[in-house]
Amino acid sequence: GVWLRPRYYKRGNENLFEGSKREAKNVRTNVGVCDVTTLGKIDIKGPDAAELLNRVYTNAWLKLPVGKARYGVMLREDGIVMDDGTTTRISENHYHMTTTTAQAANVLSHLEYYLQLVWPELNVNVVSTTEQWAGAAIAGPKSRDLLQKLFPNSDVSNEGLPFMGYMEGDLFGVKARIYRISFSGELAYEVNVESDYGNFMWEKIIEVGEEFNIQPYGTEALSTLRIEMGHVAGSELDGRTIPFDNALEGLVSKKKDFIGKRSLQRSAFTAEAVSYTHLRAHETVGN
């Protein structure tokens, strides 16, 4: 559907730049919460689920443990980056894939096409769950303290919920999925609940987070934070780039096959061209 998200949460007479800078700085110093419900979500189930992921992503997926997430890059047949995102192994034959908001429908169609016409032998079912789950990203140095208050019966310590880890928890009587994933470079988590409880989740996060100086942040601050982290998104994945353009060559397997692998070997793609480069700023939003 058509998603609407605030670019920033205005205070007083703030303009976009002032408001987003305040929000980003608060994430760097305290804790912030951002609505990430718009991310595409796809349930992948079946004994061949891992094999499907291994074929559509450029990196390896056959040995991902239950309760862990992994970042992956998906290519078109011509080698161009189609999408990126994290996929979590919920149980033995059950995976939860997230996609970018813009490519959610295209990725689902991509998977269905290959399962129906190219790999009909794979025993896998894929279904969109984008509208079934509401999501909130909780980011900042105080995010774990807040999470422990939200889920007092869960071990969200570094040992109990390591980076790229997953667990289920009870959010004041509501079943929740908890992922330790960061889009900002700070300690961060994503919490998902059934969409009917989305407002309830948001209100509880704001209420409990008051003692940690929580502030909601919009898409403008989100973009600023991800740029500072060096995470690719948006203009770097505009349908004209390959993994090597975005410093993602470490995710391209040299052993296994995947969609788009042969195209990456074309001379036009192996020659030096554009390169993803980080710049050190004199002042970041957190200073």
Question: Language-model segments: which ranges?
Answer:
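N-terminal low-complexity segments that are often proline-rich with Ser/Thr-Pro
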Residues: V285-N287
